Amino acid sequence: MKKTLLLCAFLVGLVSSNVMALTLDEARTQGRVGETFYGYLVALKTDAETEKLVADINAERKASYQQLAKQNNVSVDDIVKLAGQKLVARAKPGEYVQGINGKWVRKF
């Protein structure tokens, strides 16, 4: 339960603290990025702005995953899997997620 609350707080912080030229919400709604079950964002469009956003977000996520794992005495893989499940589950209709078969699908 504690892990879940910490993870939810982390995920909310990622979205709200991201002040970049291209925001994560914009990239999601424009179909430029997609969420994966392994907890990281993937660029679906290969322009420099999208790739920079993805690299920055993923670096923040990696650091947060490592910190959460250490605080909760669990493996980083456990945190990554939980984060991935939650990120895919909370994706809004029209946003891209990677299915368990590896194919990109638009949520509806």
Positions of the model-derived regions?
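N-terminal hydrophobic targeting signals that begin at the initiator methionine
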Residues: 1-2
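Sec-dependent N-terminal signal peptides
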Residues: 5-13
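Generic anion/oxyanion-binding catalytic loop in active/binding sites
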Residues: 10, 50, 68
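Sec/Tat signal peptide C-region and signal peptidase I cleavage site
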Residues: 16-21
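Amphipathic, charged alpha-helical segments and their helix-to-coil junctions
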Residues: 22-56, 76-108
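Short, well-ordered alpha-helical segments
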Residues: 53-69
